[in-house]
Every structure is written in structure tokens, then in C-alpha cells.
Amino acid sequence: MTQLNVVNDINHAGNWLIRNQELLLSYIINLISSIIILIIGFFAAKIISNLINKVLITQKIDTTIANFLAALVRYIIITFALIASLGCIGVQTTSVIAILGAAGMAIGLALQGSLSNFAAGVLLVILRPFRTGEYVNLEKISGTVLNIHVFYTTFRTLDGKIVVIPNGKIISGNIINYSREKARRNEFIIGVSYDSDIDKVIKILKNVVKNEKRVLKDRDIIVGLSELAPSSLNFIVRCWSHTDDINIVYWDLMVKFKKALDSNNINIPYPQFDINLKKKY
């Protein structure tokens, strides 16, 4: 009886296989397709992420950011490949996508501040309002850019302090870049006494600027009377120099203006006030 039962079971199994051979063949094909999609997805993710990493590094983008973006692209490709693979074997991908979406939303809410800083870091890399080594002003702080990281950027102030600022705060405020242009303009306000000869003062100030070798002669040099102040005639002087020389040129010209005015007996007045005293009888 036992041998007969075994034979019957084998016959039943064989008949079932014959009746359902198309269904089995379909399952096998779908399984193979699913495995192939996974393999292709993993290889594509690796190749594309490595390519992105190399391109970003050749563009002189911070290594940390380049690695992070490459890894992010890699995991996105693998996720899509996994969803497509599950779809091939009959899994309802809509439910999988819904679960992933809910998980992503929960993680996003938990890491809202960090994600905003990361997004700002990506924008800083793409838009490049400043680069490493440039001197910038960020409303409340000025300094040289040391490093641009994924979530924050470090600066060194003129007095040697290292300042770390989240990228979200940087991208949401005003950024003044003092180093991007090769040339910058200096502006001076020079006050002289009211009894000074206006034409003579303008000539003296122009000569001082023109004799300064570091002033760019192909840019406009402007000297003129800008204000009739309470205690002085205020002259404005504008000239251009290379960005690297901007501060030292300013300091040197201030000294030269003072010496030139002194040698021509032109006084730089102190603030004056008229006080009238009324005597009561």
C-alpha cells in the first residue's frame, strides 16, 4: 500500500505539473527577470555613483559632499531596482512605495534641521557664492572660507577665530564676497577747512592718487566736492586697485593725502560749534 501511495502521489504531482506548466514557466521567467534587474541595478548604481564622484571631485567640490551625493544616488538607484524586482515576482509595489514614503516622511520630520542644512550645503556647492580661500561677509561675521562641509561651513576671522556656521543660516542671509572680483574700488572722504581753494584741493588729491603705482590707471579716478558739512568741505575720492592690495592701498593713500595737504598749508578742521551767550540785565 505504501508503494502504491507513493506512485499515486508522483502521478498526481506529474499531472499537476503538466496542467500548470505554463504558470510555472511564467513564475520561473519572472524570478529570473527579478534577479537580472537586481544585478543590473547594483552594477548601474556602482558605476553611476563612481562616475558622479569623479566628476564632482574634478570640479573641485568638497570630497565629503562629493562622496555623500554619490552614495545618495547609489542608494536611490538600488531602491528603484529593488521595487522593480519585487514587481516582477508579483509583489504589490504600491504598498512598498507607500511604506517607503511614510518612513521617509518620518525621518524627514525627525531630521528637519539637518536636512535643511544639507540642502543648503548642496546649493552652496552648485551656486558657489564663495569658494575656499575667499573673504566674505555674512551680515554678522566676516572671514576667510576654510572648508565647505555637508552641513556646515568654517571661517577664520581677521583676529584668528574659527567660526562654524550651519549652511541653512548662510544660504538664508545676504552674502558679500570681497575676493571674487580681481579689482575693487576704494572710497575716501577728505575734509578740509572752508577757506581752502577747492580747485587746488582737487588737484592735490588727484596727483596723490595718480602717483600711487598700485592704483589701476585704466579705471576711473574720481575726485570731487561731495558735501558742505557743518565744519568742513568734504571731498570724495574714488579709485580702483587689485583686490589683494585694497587695504594696504587705502592705508597708504590716507597717509599720503594728509602729508600732501599739510605741505600745501591746507588745514583739516576739527568739528566746530558756535556758542552764543546771552547776558541778562
Swiss-Prot record:
Residues spanning the membrane: 23-45, 65-87, 94-116
Entry membrane topology: Multi-pass membrane protein
UniProt GO molecular function: mechanosensitive monoatomic ion channel activity
Keyword Membrane set for record: yes
Compartments in which it is found: Cell membrane
GO CC term, one of those recorded: plasma membrane
Highest taxon above the source species: Bacteria
Keywords, in A-Z order: Cell membrane, Membrane, Transmembrane, Transmembrane helix
Annotated InterPro entries: LSM_dom_sf, MS_channel_1st, MS_channel_C, MSC_TM_helix, MscS_archaea/bacteria_type, MscS_beta-dom_sf, MscS_channel_2nd, MscS_channel_C_sf
Ranges in a coiled coil: none
Family from the record: Belongs to the MscS (TC 1.A.23) family.
The protein's name in its UniProt record: Uncharacterized MscS family protein bbp_402
Organism annotation: Buchnera aphidicola subsp. Baizongia pistaciae (strain Bp)
Lineage of the organism: Bacteria, Pseudomonadati, Pseudomonadota, Gammaproteobacteria, Enterobacterales
